Every structure is written in structure tokens, then in C-alpha cells.
UniProtKB/Swiss-Prot annotation:
Protein name as it appears in the record: Urease subunit beta
Any single Gene Ontology cellular-component annotation: urease complex
InterPro entries associated with the record: Urease_beta-like, Urease_betasu_sf, Urease_subunit
Oligomer and partners: Heterotrimer of UreA (gamma), UreB (beta) and UreC (alpha) subunits. Three heterotrimers associate to form the active enzyme.
Catalytic activity, reaction form: urea + 2 H2O + H(+) = hydrogencarbonate + 2 NH4(+)
Organism: Prochlorococcus marinus (strain MIT 9215)
Annotated family: Belongs to the urease beta subunit family.
Length: 106
């Protein structure tokens, strides 16, 4: 019998560098609301909750530079710097707050 567990993932040793070669942009974000706001790894940051105060124009087409499936939580009154990277692939964005619903490049 094998010692492997079904569905088990055994990663190689060492560090995995995320978003290698992508432009990284740092943005200062403040939560002006009275509730925490959580933003996921692949959320179009430009469309994030309106209680988050930041330069939205420079975040168009960008997402958080964090591992897939994770998120950053912004507590009320807190200000923090986050790192963003551009979406890649087809660069089509649908849903979120319905501000784009199409190509990020047109």
C-alpha cells in the first residue's frame, strides 16, 4: 500500500515567488466605514467597497498581490499600504460592482 493520502499535495521544497515579473504598485488604503471590509485576492480593487478610501484611478485593472484564495481585512479607521498587480490573461472583468463588465483594455 502507498503512504499517499487521496488528494494530497506535496510541494517542492523552497519558496514560490508569486506574480513573477509583474508590475507591483503600492497603494495606501483607509477604511472610513464603521465595519470591517475584506477584499479577496482576485477582486478588482478599483471596484472595492466605497468605504475604502484610496486613489481608485491608479488601481484600475489591478488586484491584490497575495496568494489565491486569501484576503486582506481592513478594520474601521485603519490605514494600511497594500501591493497590487495587474490582472493578466484575457483581462475581462465581470460582476463585482458592475463598473467594468467587459475588457479592462477597451
Amino acid at each position: 500500500m502507498s503512504n499517499f493520502i487521496p488528494g494530497e499535495i506535496i510541494p517542492e521544497k523552497g519558496e514560490i515567488e508569486l506574480n513573477l515579473g509583474k508590475e507591483i504598485r503600492t497603494v495606501t488604503v483607509s477604511n472610513s466605514g464603521d465595519r470591517p471590509v475584506q477584499v479577496g485576492s482576485h477582486y478588482h480593487f478599483f471596484e472595492a467597497n466605497k468605504a475604502l478610501i484610496f486613489d481608485r484611478k491608479i488601481t484600475f485593472g489591478m488586484r491584490l498581490n497575495i496568494p489565491a484564495g486569501t484576503a486582506i481585512r481592513f478594520e474601521p479607521g485603519d490605514t494600511t499600504d497594500v501591493k497590487l498587480v495587474p490582472f493578466s490573461g484575457l483581462r475581462n472583468v465581470y460582476g463585482f460592482n458592475s463598473l467594468v463588465n467587459g475588457s479592462l483594455d477597451n
